[in-house]
A protein has these predicted regions:
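Short coil-to-helix leader/linker segments, especially the first N-terminal amphipathic alpha-helix
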Residues: 1-4, 114-116
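Flexible, low-complexity segments enriched in proline/glycine/serine and punctuated by aromatic residues
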Residues: 19, 40-49, 53-155
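Aliphatic-rich helix starts adjacent to a transmembrane/signal segment
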Residues: 2-8, 12-56
Length: 155
């Protein structure tokens, strides 16, 4: 029969436990990193979806008020002042556009971090049909970058 010296085997169990704990810790850190990356991607997708909804919303408002013409044109981060009564009484097309833009801009600031908005009006080829280029920008969370989404609306 073979005799095993206990003195030679001492400490091996502790080393095995330390190696297993290290492997487990590395695995847990990798899992946490994946969760954080997934949450960041979900937040980015949520912001892109909100921006697409904002573009669609203003596009529908422009289509619903074709008489407003250039009243929907706004420089970056500017909104015209809406009428004091917010069109609760009768309003012309330009006043309705001012209310639409003020509401839309307020909503953009509520759903997108660092929101910037702009609407440019053009008549390509010297024609009479107007095109509205709607732009929404926002700050990407956790980065010093901005995301941007544009749409062209032809009423």
């Amino acid at each position: 029969m073979r005799t095993v010296h206990l003195a030679a085997r001492r400490g091996y169990a502790l080393v095995e436990v330390l190696v297993a704990a290290t492997v487990l810790a590395i695995g847990l850190l990798g899992g946490v990193a994946l969760l954080l990356d997934g949450a960041r991607a979900a937040r980015g997708a949520r912001h892109a979806t909100a921006a697409a909804g904002l573009l669609s919303d203003l596009g529908e408002r422009i289509r619903a008020n074709p008489a407003a013409g250039d009243a929907y044109a706004i420089a970056a981060n500017r909104s015209p002042e809406p009428p004091a009564d917010r069109c609760e009484s009768t309003c012309d097309a330009a006043s309705i556009a001012a209310v639409d833009l003020a509401d839309w801009r307020q909503h953009a600031e509520a759903v997108l971090p660092g929101a910037r908005t702009a609407v440019a009006v053009a008549t390509p080829d010297g024609g009479t049909a107007r095109q509205y280029r709607i732009t929404v920008e926002w700050t990407v969370a956790g980065r010093d970058q901005r995301a941007r989404l544009d749409a062209v609306v032809v009423p």
